């Protein structure tokens, strides 16, 4: 029974295996026949892959030709970036060139200004040397020696005399400012009265020098001193007979010297009164001089007009002019008396006040005139429409 079943199974297996073997043999025979016929057999999978690769290459080649696709965009962007960089570089170069040109122009203008400034300095130095030479010649000829000497030679040197006076006064003013600065420092430092007294005496002696200087200047050119052209404009506005009014200066000092004793107060009041009276007398004398001088000149002119050009008329004319010249000599006396009044007022003030009060008074006087000079500078520097 078992043997019968095994034979049956083998028969069934053979039945199924024979067809398979036959099919395999047939296939092998077919392959051999195809090989002989020269037909290429390819797998469908192999065909599909080859087709995809060829299409990809073609597309890539096409994109490269037309500039499309991602590669073309990247190349375009790269070219745009390069162009922008070049443009920025060009603009930067242009700005640099403009900046260099501006710097060269500024340097050129600076050199021109420097050259003009140097030329101005050279010109000023030349003028200063010329003035120093004029001053030296004036000193050698015996005029305007502040320490004393004869000023009679001043009459023969009109222009040089006034120039020398202006230079000497400017120098005196600088030295005076140094004296005042020393006095101010000493007063603020609360120095002893003995030390302070030496500085006060130095300032008073310096005032003596300027009055001697003006005396010689008056002999050289009385009208120059009278006009006050050696002073600042604001100082000339308050000027009286070639200088300050003593009575007005005492009014300025009165409010800065307190407290004063009764005796000092009375002395200042009496000094102010006497100064005012002397000023009034000199002013009246000046008015009378102007009147008589004007009348003399009118008489001389009338003589020439009425008498023609005869010898007698010329003689009369010259006589009238000689009288007028003599009256101008009186003008010099008025200026000297006015300076003498100013000088004596300062000396009297010094005697009335204590050392510290006198020091303060000298500072007040100096500051007053300094403010006038500062006002003049501001006025001259004002903008003009």
From Swiss-Prot:
Region (Leucine-zipper): 121-135
Identification of the protein by name: Transcription factor TGAL3
InterPro entries: bZIP, bZIP_sf, TGA_domain
Region named Basic motif: 95-115
UniProt GO molecular function: DNA-binding transcription factor activity; sequence-specific DNA binding
Gene Ontology BP terms: defense response; DNA-templated transcription
Species per Swiss-Prot/TrEMBL record: Oryza sativa subsp. japonica
Signal peptide: none
Gene3D superfamilies membership: 1.20.5.170
Family classification: Belongs to the bZIP family.
SMART domains cross-referenced by the UniProt entry: BRLZ (SM00338)
């Amino acid at each position: 029974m078992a043997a019968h079943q095994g034979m049956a199974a083998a028969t069934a297996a053979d039945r199924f295996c024979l067809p398979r073997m036959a099919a395999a043999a047939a296939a092998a025979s077919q392959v051999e026949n195809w090989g002989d016929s020269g037909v290429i057999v390819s797998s469908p999978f192999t065909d599909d892959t080859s087709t995809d690769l060829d299409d990809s290459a073609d597309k890539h080649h096409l994109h490269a030709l037309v500039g499309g696709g991602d590669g073309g965009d990247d190349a375009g962007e790269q070219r745009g970036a390069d162009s922008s960089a070049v443009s920025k570089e060009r603009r930067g170069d242009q700005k640099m060139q403009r900046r260099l040109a501006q710097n060269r122009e500024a340097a050129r203008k600076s050199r021109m200004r420097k050259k003009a400034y140097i030329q101005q300095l050279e010109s000023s130095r030349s003028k200063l040397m010329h003035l120093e030479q004029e001053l030296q010649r004036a000193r050698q000829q015996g005029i305007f020696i502040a320490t004393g000497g004869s000023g009679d030679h001043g009459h023969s040197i009109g222009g040089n005399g006034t120039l020398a006076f202006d230079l000497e006064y400017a120098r005196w003013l600088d030295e005076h400012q140094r004296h005042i600065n020393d006095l101010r420092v000493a007063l603020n430092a609360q120095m002893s009265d003995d030390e302070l007294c030496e500085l006060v005496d130095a300032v008073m002696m310096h005032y003596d020098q300027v009055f001697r200087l003006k005396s010689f200047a008056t002999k050289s050119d009385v009208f120059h001193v009278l006009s006050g052209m050696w002073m600042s404009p604001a100082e000339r506005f308050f000027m009286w007979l070639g200088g300050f009014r003593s009575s007005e200066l005492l009014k300025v000092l009165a409010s800065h010297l307190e407290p004063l004793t009764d005796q000092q107060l009375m002395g200042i009041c009496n000094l102010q009164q006497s100064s005012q009276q002397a000023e009034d007398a000199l002013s009246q004398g000046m008015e009378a001089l102007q009147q008589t001088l004007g009348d003399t000149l009118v008489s001389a002119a009338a003589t020439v007009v009425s008498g023609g050009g005869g010898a007698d008329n010329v003689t009369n004319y010259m006589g009238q002019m000689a009288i007028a010249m003599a009256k101008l000599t009186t003008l010099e006396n008025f200026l000297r008396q006015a300076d003498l009044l100013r000088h004596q007022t300062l000396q009297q003030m010094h005697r009335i006040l204590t050392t510290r009060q006198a020091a303060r008074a000298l500072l007040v006087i100096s500051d007053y005139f300094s403010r006038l000079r500062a006002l003049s500078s501001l006025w001259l520097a004002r903008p003009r429409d």
